[in-house]
Curated annotation (Swiss-Prot):
It is found in: Endoplasmic reticulum. GO terms for cellular component: endoplasmic reticulum. This is Uncharacterized protein C685.03. It comes from Schizosaccharomyces pombe (strain 972 / ATCC 24843). It comes from the Eukaryota. The keyword Signal applies. Residues 130-151 are annotated as: Disordered. Residues 1-20 form the signal peptide. Keywords: Endoplasmic reticulum, Signal.
Amino acid sequence: MQFFGSLFVSLLGAAGLANALPSPGIPSNDKDLAIYPPVDANNTTSQDVVIDVVLFNGTEWISSRERFSLVSPGWASIYGPSGQSSVGSVLYSPILDYIDNAQLLVLDDVSFGVFSSLANSVTGYASNYTQSSSNSTSTMNSTGSVSGGSVYPTNSTTNSSISWNSSTSAATNTSSSSSSSSQSSVVSVNSEIFSYFGLSQQYVNYSTSRLCVVGTPRANMSTVSVTNNGSAVSNYTVNTNGWTSSNFKCVDDVVANIFGLDFYTAAVLSEVSILRSFALCNATTSSSLFRQIASYGVYGSFHFSSSESGSFANLIGTNNYFMTDVKSSSVVIVQSETSCSINSASMSSNTTYFYWNSTSSLSSSVFTNTTSSSNSTNSSIPTTYPSNSTTYQNITTSYPWSQPVVNITDYLSDNGDGHFVLAGDGNQTIGDFYVMNWTTIASGEYLVPFNY
């Protein structure tokens, strides 16, 4: 499988490659490291991981195998404001200084297979990683020799990452090992990384997940330089055109009032996005989704006027966006529906519209039985209110609720499917989210893990 290679990014000026990346040692005064306890990659007690970095330049998949230092264990939480705000707050590598919207992409077996097959044009180049400072001989080279701390390989026989191009198999780094044989296992490698992000196995399978870092080449870059085992250099033009996105009004306090502070915390403050990959059931959609993830990051919105995006309409109707505001997430987990039996009807045919405005208190009119022309199928909207509808009266916007005001399960189908549209004055969509098999999978403004 042709996939990962090694990426060096350079800023090109009048001197061409003269302004290339500095020696990739970890500076002690780096802005990421200044916030958290300092980590010295040259220290034999430091814990490093080797993770592949993937970019899509609009035409080709290009990638780099990079050494990351684990910076801040135990700070993240999937719920609450303590979640990590960036990959760089947990994993540090100099390459992050040249990439915007860096996210840790976590794939299961099925989504991994789709991603790797889509990215089969990755060149598979590999380059040496040479540390600066006193440990100048520490490299990640064709023999896989890395010193100066524990390095957890992610490309082993049981593979926790997408494998290299076979033509550069000498650079797979499989001979790297940690100080403990047990730590070199895939489960421990993933556990080490996930624990730093605060991800429990409730949300991600430690033993089968494949990891890579994806992001956007910074706008001031015009070229990515890829070295072939430290020798030949090939330059690839980077397409830095942004992705057009829609802006949706978000009334945070009303969201908290309707769905509760727990929902608000998970939806607005969580740094982890979980995609139930119903999109993987459609090859064209898969291509569009993963190319978007690897090139620009998952953010903004997927517009039907964009390349390949007509496939999204087949999945979720004619609404002009798929999901928004995932850009702020530091981790995107793609979990697959292996049967691929779920289709757009199971979501859009069971749609509930919640209406409010940003100035008046919430009332039972939030359940107004209204149809929307934005859906491709007729909506089945509940015509009766929950028995405790009186509790919806005179709710203020002061985050008083620790439990959701609306019991979402009252509006799910027997299969646990539902589509919830949050709308304000003039039927303006503020946000929406989808539930499949009792699990929140995708949203407008919100993409959150849900426990019912």
